[in-house]
Amino acid sequence: MNCMKCKVSENPSIKEAYRLIEDGIRKRALVVILACCSASYEGRARSRLDAGERLIVIKPDGTFMVHQDRKVDPVNWQPPKSRSRAYIKRGSLYLESIRRDPEERLEVEIHEAHLVSYYLARDVHDLMVAGHENDMGDMIIMHPHLIEKGFRPVAREYAVTSGFIDILGKDENGSLMIIELKSRKAGVSAVKQLKRYVDEFREDRVGVRGVLVAPSITHDAMEMLEEEGLEFREIEPPRELRSNRGVTLDNFL
């Protein structure tokens, strides 16, 4: 099947598959291949994937993926800005994807191509998301009273030894407040994470408050929170769709 934006070839010969794949890569099209193939990777490690029926996708931005018939993630992949090519060696068809920094190479041997296609896709829209921790952070920065009256945020994604604090702020008395955000029910691991952040600051000062913010919390997590002298705020993440550009403290300084 051929049209102005796509070309498809079923059970192509090696030369037909090569020409179609190279044409798709040259045109910066979305290349989709169903084939029996094997793969080898060399870079920060080494791996070998024996022959099997798989889906191969080469995207216009250089992304290269080999999918099996199970699981969400590809079994082999190369990130955007990798360089892909097809070539024939000793009568076999190969695909190669190379990343320069760090130096990585993924080679796929096509043993039998069942379907080769490419599509001149055009997609300029960003994903609209809602309900993540970043959305909660934006909402709290814009409406700090949701934490409590007098709360003043001073930093986001504040780096400490044990990770990144979602929001760092001060209460109306000037005491430091560490805010840990969870967009779903918070568990014991969230409490432990918050405690690590608070402990780092309590080594140098007194009056540090840790607040876990989530739409709900497990019974065990609430017990641990109270035992550690930490606090909980029940706040639902915003549900309105928005672009992936977040609100920063610069908007309010």
From Swiss-Prot:
Protein's UniProt keywords contain Phosphoprotein: no
Gene Ontology MF terms: DNA binding; single-stranded DNA endodeoxyribonuclease activity
Alphabetical list of InterPro entries matching this protein: Endonuclease_NucS, NucS_C, NucS_N, NucS_N_sf, tRNA_endonuc-like_dom_sf
Enzyme class, broadest EC rank: hydrolase
CDD domains (UniProt xref): NucS-like
Localisation per UniProt entry: Cytoplasm
Cysteine pairings via disulfide bonds: none
Pfam families: NucS_C, NucS_N
Keywords: Cytoplasm, DNA-binding, Endonuclease, Hydrolase, Nuclease
Record flagged with keyword Aminoacyl-tRNA synthetase: no
Function: Cleaves both 3' and 5' ssDNA extremities of branched DNA structures.
HAMAP family: NucS
Family according to the record: Belongs to the NucS endonuclease family.
Protein name according to UniProt: Endonuclease NucS
Lineage: Archaea, Methanobacteriati, Methanobacteriota, Methanomada group, Methanobacteria
Gene: nucS
